[in-house]
Amino acid sequence: MTEPATPPVVLAVDGPAGSGKSSVSKAAAGRLGWAYLDTGAAYRALGWYVVERGLDPADPAVVIDSLPDFDYRIGTDPDTYRVFVGERDVTEAIREPRVTAVVSAIARVPQVRASLTRLFREIIAGSGKAGIVVEGRDITTVVCPDALVRILLTADEAVRMNRRSAELTGHSAARVGEALRKRDAADSRVVDFMNAAEGVITVDSTELDFDQTVDAVIAVVQKETHV
């Protein structure tokens, strides 16, 4: 009789826009030799799928009707993962402004969140690694509330604005800050990602550089899991 596969250790990472969730989570996964799952990519991919077909992403019924045919796949290698809808590689396309503009509306639909949460759990279970770093907005409270390690990664708003504007050539800190505030305000209607839930450890990177932040996250993992 075949023994059931041991489920991976899960590091769940939440946080506001511009907190460095994606870059820090990928780096931590790489150093730990774990898989990595960017849950936000699924919402972006669904937004792309709706917009690409000329449908209205602001109409919840339209978005819900798109779910059965939404053939989504994502890799879990932190260094080389790609995002596909059907056979089309949309890794870059889902970062386009037209997609970013509709993501919050897509993510506010309860049926979408429920469907994608089920998908995320399937991906986590089949990751094939000893552990997986899962990052997003509601990972510590909804997707993986029982994760062995749960972290809220945050930083002061001014720091988040400056970091994001440095990533986006030609965008002022003020413009980026306004975009971050709007996105956080829209997403906070659905889930509280600004405050750590019970049992969630806060890592504040306001005074830390990138490498120090990754070190801090790994230190939490080592303390909680003894890896």
From Swiss-Prot:
One of its GO terms (molecular function) is dCMP kinase activity. InterPro entries: Cytidylate_kin, Cytidylate_kinase_dom, P-loop_NTPase. GO terms for biological process: pyrimidine nucleotide metabolic process. Keywords: ATP-binding, Cytoplasm, Kinase, Nucleotide-binding, Transferase. GO terms for cellular component: cytoplasm. It catalyses: CMP + ATP = CDP + ADP; dCMP + ATP = dCDP + ADP. It holds the Pfam family Cytidylate_kin. HAMAP family: Cytidyl_kinase_type1. This is Cytidylate kinase. It comes from Leifsonia xyli subsp. xyli (strain CTCB07). The gene is cmk.
